[in-house]
Amino acid sequence: MHHPAEHSPLGKTSEYVSRYTPSLLFPIARAAKWAELGLSAATLPYRGVDIWNCYELSWLTPAGKPVVAIGEFSIPADSPNIIESKSFKLYLNSLNQSSFDSRDALRAVLEQDLSVAAGAAVGVRLRSLDEVAEEGVGRLPGRCIDELEIAVDGYERPRPELLRCDAGRFVEEQLYSHLLKSNCPVTGQPDWGTLVVDYRGPALDPASLLAYLVSFRQHQDFHEQCVERIFLDLRRLLQPQALTVYARYVRRGGLDINPYRSLVDVAPDNRRLVRQ
């Protein structure tokens, strides 16, 4: 079965266009991947958002002077489509030699184009470099599980059977790991990420969580689907009162992708981590 992204610019030699070209955006329907997980648009068990940060955003003023900013794009997790990442990059590059009357004018164009591609309203923030620098590098709350000793004998597929919990002990905690890795389903390139699990429910065995996350190491899928799979596997095991799964992926091509899935209100912290 062919992956829908095979028809996108991903993995292909592309001409870089420097004049505004919204047709470069390549949407990919979420429905097929939802179906693989037993979901549909009507049965999504989470709320969420995919936050994209762009560090290579530039355009021209009417006088021809370049402007730079850091873009933050929030795509609802229940939108009909994701936007293929290379097409997103090519689209943003097409702004480089294009003139806009103001920052607000550009933001309106971005909101319009990205919302059409995603099939839902996309939030856009254009942030100054000083503003983002002032935030600094974020530090994760909770416990890092990466120093736990585990034995690993499989990397080819996610292994939810490794997950364990103590049904007799109820906790509220945050666990995180920097060892998440999966591969692009089209190019096979590695995607490196940090994963945060914030939950209230039966105590999750942290070593089993680490072994489970490592089992994604050779798995091929997009960032968004990896996080949704992790969310569903943890929800199935824990039946928690609250659960949030949040991944912060290392940037590629000037873009990083940060999927957030939760049983509760959507309130992600978008400060970049040290590898971003």
Curated annotation (Swiss-Prot):
It catalyses: 7-aminomethyl-7-carbaguanine + 2 NADP(+) = 7-cyano-7-deazaguanine + 2 NADPH + 3 H(+). InterPro entries: GTP-CH-I_C/QueF (IPR043133), NADPH_dep_7-cyano-7-deazaG_red (IPR050084), QueF (IPR029500), QueF_N (IPR029139), QueF_type2 (IPR016428). Keywords: Cytoplasm, NADP, Oxidoreductase, Queuosine biosynthesis. The keyword Signal does not apply. Pfam families: QueF (PF14489), QueF_N (PF14819). One of its GO terms (molecular function) is preQ1 synthase activity. SUPFAM superfamilies: Tetrahydrobiopterin biosynthesis enzymes-like. GO terms for biological process: queuosine biosynthetic process; tRNA modification. It comes from the Bacteria. It is found in: Cytoplasm. Its EC number is 1.7.1.13. Substrate binds at I83, E84, S85, H223, E224. The active site is at C184 (thioimide intermediate), D191 (proton donor). Homodimer. Belongs to the GTP cyclohydrolase I family. QueF type 2 subfamily. Catalyzes the NADPH-dependent reduction of 7-cyano-7-deazaguanine (preQ0) to 7-aminomethyl-7-deazaguanine (preQ1). This is NADPH-dependent 7-cyano-7-deazaguanine reductase. It comes from Pseudomonas paraeruginosa (strain DSM 24068 / PA7). The gene is queF.
